[in-house]
Amino acid sequence: MLKTIKTKKNTTKYTLVALVAGFALLSVGSSYIHARSAQKLSNSNLSNITANTNTDGFQQSNHYNTPKGFMNDIQTIFKGTDDYYHLYYLLNKNYKSSNDGTEWYHIRTKDWEHFEDLGVAIPKFVNGWSAVASGSVYQNSNGFFRDLPKTAIIAYFTSYTETGQHQYAAYSLDDGRTYHPYNHSQPVMKAESKEQNFRDPHVWYNESTKKLMMYLAEGDKVGIYSSTDGKKWEYQGATMLNGSTLAGKDLGLIECPNLKSFYDPQTKTTKHVLLFGANGYQYGSTTGSYYMIGHLEANGNFVAEQQPERLDHGTDYYGANYYQESPTRVKSIGWMGNWEYSQGQILKDDGQEAKHIGSMSSTHSLSMTQKDGKYVVRSRLINNNARTSGLRTKQSARTSKTAPDGYHKELIKVNRKASQEISLHFANNTANTKGHVRVFIRQKDSHVSVDLNTETGTYEVKRNSSKITGEAKNKYEKAYAVHNNWQNRQRYFVYLVADKGSLEIAMPDGQIYSLMKLSSDPNMQVVVESSTDNSVSATLCDFQNKTR
């Protein structure tokens, strides 16, 4: 029997607790949800909230959607003088039309949930540059730029010009809302050739040398440069990410480098972490976000100590950016998309090609810990949006009917809204969890399946959609298998954040799998099956729409 949990609007009236291998896991407010998730953040006084302004049918309720066109890479996240968190992303408002090209679009937030549109901050095709691509900003609070006030914000970005990928600079005097060309509209760095990969500058200040540092994506390496004035840059090394440094398997084209530090309170150790976008095609994966643990030399060069690891194991967490919240915590937001199919032929309900698509991920909270002799970055989803219409059930394979395949037992089959929080606690009735547990998210135009092997610590994710056609469809519907190394346990916990066009899966031990699902259906069916004598305790709640 399914039980409805009576809740009031904007409040959560219950908390379901399970003890898993010594960790307290909460279905609402879990280790995968920030502890503040039960607070009433829906009373935010943000104005002009536009989380649901995508009008082509692909809008999401619980994620930020671009107001028009096509969005991709997330740019620097910084805290402004107005006490808001500001970020930019690449927007092509003329997607698949004339005057095609990206520019920096500006949004801000106070709670990492509700976002306010502020408009285009760095426009394309002006001031000597062409389309505006990825980069980062530097707040001049220490007066490094002597010709600019300490309140200035300086943006460095790549522009794809007719002669190659060049780095430009611009400055803002109004908290990042508008930018003016710096260095007389001339590039501060130029690619040596039209073909050279030379982009996505990440700038930061090196306290040891009193120089400004720049990390650049250069094909299979991250180039490292320094400057005493922010205009003239000197090469001082590189972090190689080719096959010879990665045990024979490269990571394809490197993009969007970033650098953050993490302190592990257990070992009392601080490490620097190089974050970047790459292609895991040689590792049974696709493009995604990666990290590498290491340290900095005094001159600002990054030195790797471990091999790269996948930050988010899903297909659609790319062009991510990061905010250093504290020595132990970094927040991250990614673009929910993939260059292999996001620009393919995606269809609206009327059969016409969609020219308006794109959303951001939920915020990830990152921390570092030591496991099996090496340091790993763990992620948890932050979702403080209000929950309503709770549903709780506990089912056992012993008393459940046989699934249509004649083999699995159907533990749960329920119709819900597409924007949904799903907490699943699995246990075996006699011993450790065994066999396969399958979770299906079904919409009229989209299906996603997650097949968890509780004995081997692996899971496989498959999806299909009638909204995508052509070659991109084959790439979109390719299945991927992932190791989560969580096997032979008495308890197995899976937490899912579903929305109309996305699914984020939090596995035990801090692993997240994010994916885009192309759908315009506002409803879905949730099905949970088991191949053996497992039981499940499940809680499902509607996420309240972020818009007013």
At which residue positions do the language-model features occur?
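Bacterial Sec-dependent N-terminal signal peptides
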Residues: 1-17
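Classical Sec-dependent N-terminal signal peptides that target proteins to the secretory pathway
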Residues: 13-28
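Compositionally biased, intrinsically disordered low-complexity segments
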Residues: 8, 20-23, 531
